[in-house]
C-alpha cells in the first residue's frame, strides 16, 4: 500500500517485483 515503487500502472500492470497496481500508481504493501 505504500507508493514507493516509482512506477505508474495506467495500463494496469507493474513491472517492479513486489509491487501491485493501485491505479494509476504501483504500490508496495
Curated annotation (Swiss-Prot):
It holds the Pfam family Cyclotide. It comes from the Eukaryota. InterPro entries: Cyclotide, Cyclotide_moebius_CS, Cyclotide_sf. Keywords: Disulfide bond, Plant defense. It comes from Melicytus dentatus (Tree violet). GO terms for biological process: defense response. Probably participates in a plant defense mechanism. Belongs to the cyclotide family. Moebius subfamily. This is Cyclotide mden-A. There is a cross-link at residues 1-29 (Cyclopeptide (Gly-Asn)).
Amino acid at each position: 500500500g505504500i507508493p514507493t515503487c516509482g512506477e505508474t500502472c495506467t495500463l494496469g500492470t507493474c513491472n517492479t517485483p513486489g509491487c501491485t497496481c493501485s491505479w494509476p500508481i504501483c504500490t508496495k504493501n
